[in-house]
Amino acid sequence: MITLKNGDGIKWPHGKRIAVLLTFDFDAEYLRYSVTGQSALGFSDISRGQYGPHEGLKRCLDMLARQNIKTTFFVPGIVAEKYTDEVKQIAAAGHELAYHGYAHDARPGIPEAEEEANMAKAEAILEAISGKKVVGHRAPLDTLQTYGVKLMQKRGYLYSSTLKDCDWAYIHEGEHPVVELPTEPGFDDFSFFYFSYADAHTITCSYPAEYVYNMWKDAFDELANESDKIMCLKLHPQLIGRSSRIRMLERLVLYMRQNGAWIAGCEEVARYVLAQNGKETDADAVAK
């Protein structure tokens, strides 16, 4: 599956030591619905999710603008329908909109036909906002269905960012190759900042921002030393968008840049990986 430049041995642009992806999952109050059900969450949990569109998103967009970063936002279709103006702001700022389910449904075993209908519906919503074809996929709550890669290839996706099996980008081979940009629970702000009394299905935690900064900085340093890796942060405006946390993230961005990071969006990194492997890089050439 993994070829010479498809992971181990890849050289990043301009002599950079590592590819860093600051990705955002804009889930709003739908983050945990498919696990707990709306009725199981108290209003405080729902309103905490709404902090993303109400306040956290603006802080994230402002920080990205200050640092001149264009990145990727994974947006469920239902969130784009409810918070259309906010998603338009994301697209207007030059960020990529990528698939993240329609209703952020993370049930294992969703029938393939149902999931393909979800994809078609969400793609149409996001494409109407951005004017661009959706080429990126992240499964809700990282629940990638067994047929998921095959369905991405069928629908002409360029990349996936769900699996956690290594620290480099690699290719799902086939007639229409799909790049995997792996994530890791330790790079997810949910692991450190999600706090809920009502949600018994997950942990209750709230770490200091400085603790997370040091953990992510140490991870960055070690991955950068290996020179062919990616570091894919998975962030949520409702969590990282709190005032002290977004400042922590901006400090980390500055540190990474000073120490050899290529900070880019998922589509740009995926196209680079394909090009390094002599693969087709025009996902628009694949008919849906």
Task: Name each model feature, range by range.
Residues M1-G136, L141-G186, V212-L233, L239-K288:
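Catalytic alpha-helical scaffold of carbohydrate-active enzymes acting on polysaccharides/glycoconjugates
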Residues V134, Y197-A209, P237-Q238:
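Surface-exposed cleft-lining segments at the edges of enzyme active sites
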Residues P182-I203:
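Glycine-rich, positively charged active-site loop/lid region within alpha/beta enzyme cores that binds
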